[in-house]
Amino acid sequence: MNATEAGLDDSITDFSRRRVDVDGVVKTVYVSGDGPGVVLMPEMPGISPDVLRLARWVRDAGFTVYVPSLFGADGAYPTAENGQEVVRRACVSAEFRAFAGGGTSPVTAWLRGLARQAHGECGGPGVGAIGLCFTGNFALTMTLEPSVIAPVVNHPSLPLDDPAGLELGDEDARAVRERVERDGITVLAYRFDNDRWCTGQRFAAYRKLLGDAFDGRVLPGGAARTDPPPFFRDVVQTPHSVTTAHLVDEDGHPTLKARDEIIAYLAARLHS
């Protein structure tokens, strides 16, 4: 039984806790593993036990995982009350663009710097980036950093008020499309078919922007875990987190297959 199944916080003792400076902005990053670098960004409401479980799976598959603290209490079990407060703070933060018309979240510039540092430390052909929920689209924006060659966009929820929108400014959208076309990057993405926060309209918008470079995979909502932590049960209220809170850790399960596909994608891009 892991921490989330027991309703406990995760102490994160198997990761080194670093203070990482990018252009004078310092954030906490949890690092563990050996091999090519993968930046795994948290979903709302923070670096939960489920996010850390995914990070450990990636680490154990032969990667160095970097988990930046962007919001919430690190390692905390996601309760409804605390999670709602984290969302409220993030929605008005200068680092994020949660609503339509806001363009690209400024924090992605810092994340690109983290990817550069990870590549410098780990070497290899490049770095992977996994975004989840609130940070889902950040993995795509990070391809503006040349070292990022394996973006995974999981259930991207921004902008919150436009189901067909993308959390990207026009100039960045053009630059991302050009980078993807120029370097032959495939963008891997996942959602549940009945997710209200990441709809088919959003995946259609990605397809319009990226064409065949967008590999959007859709799982049946009925495959989602039925007893997720309180934040997901009471606030999210829909199948959403394919590889974290709504993952079912059983052999052959569609969500576990999605996890395996992500790891295989990272291995194909980063271990070559």
Give the role of each language-model region.
Residues 1-272:
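N-terminal cap/leader regions of alpha/beta-hydrolase-fold enzymes
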